[in-house]
Amino acid sequence: MFIIYLFIFLSSAIIDSNGVAMAQKIEAIGGKGGKRWDDGANDNVAKVYIRGDHEGIQYIKFDYVKDGQSFNGSVHGVSADGFTQTFEIDHLQYEQIVSVEGYYDWKTGVMQALQFKTNLKTSEFIGYQKGTKFSLGVDGKVIVGFHGSAWRSLRSLGAYVKTAPTKSELQGGITGGEYWDDGPNFDGVRKVYVTFTETHIRSMNIDYDQDGQVVTRYHGMKNGETQEFAVDFPNEYMTSVEGTYDHISEGNYLVLTSLTFKTSKGRISQTFGLVIGTKFVLETKGNVISGFHGRDGGSFDAIGVYFSPMISS
């Protein structure tokens, strides 16, 4: 039995106008012939549908998530007598496909079996494990779309991959308040609104960009002075958050006392709050901020971020 590992054959990266990495294309592997199809790069894969029989996989179909909306992809191949199996990915819990393993018959050119692995679970092999084995994926990246070839059966399969967002640890009071998580699936940060008093940060609202639309998330209690900082998205990205945290006399809680934001153009926001206590910096070279998470109760207790890669032009 031949085994092929496809973890390195990548075409050039797909990037946006600011050099933020969108996706890379892994070349398709499998049999020859058939009509080429290409679902393109999306935000996530939501569900996999496979129809097959003893001769191999007849067709494959994917449901995707793009710009926060789920949609049904096209059927690649044809349907005949046989079995149908599905595999669901819980994208709302940030589950993502990280690799695909499979088998194809090099004589007939027909895909025989596929298995999908996510960051949370692994499917069973769908189909029959015979022929040439292959693996499709890139370490440290997630699959956000597929392409390949098909005729009366699935012939080959390739993928679009992107670097998985990195989630930072929380800074501040990590036990107080309730935990919240906006997730990493935004295009960028447009504006932040920070409410603070003489002693600590009370709340932070964030305007995210998602496919050109503003999506706002609210965290904390808006009691105090509110100031804002705007990012010139999509010409500019937020890249760094600096701040301090300390115990306050009201219950001796550990909370955030100040916040400052930096952008890809080197701009620095005003300092929100009072710089006192332990200092922290949330920044990773070559990355931009694509989402926030944190804790809040009566005060804004803690903050963390999601980083997505930027490719220098």
Swiss-Prot record:
InterPro entries: Jacalin-like_lectin_dom, Jacalin-like_lectin_dom_plant, Jacalin-like_lectin_dom_sf. GO terms for molecular function: carbohydrate binding. CDD domains: Jacalin (cd09612). Keywords: Lectin, Repeat, Signal. Residues 1-23 form the signal peptide. Pfam families: Jacalin. SUPFAM superfamilies: Mannose-binding lectins. Residues 24-163, 165-309 form the Jacalin-type lectin domain. Belongs to the jacalin lectin family. This is Jacalin-related lectin 8. It comes from Arabidopsis thaliana (Mouse-ear cress). The lineage of its organism: Eukaryota, Viridiplantae, Streptophyta, Embryophyta, Tracheophyta.
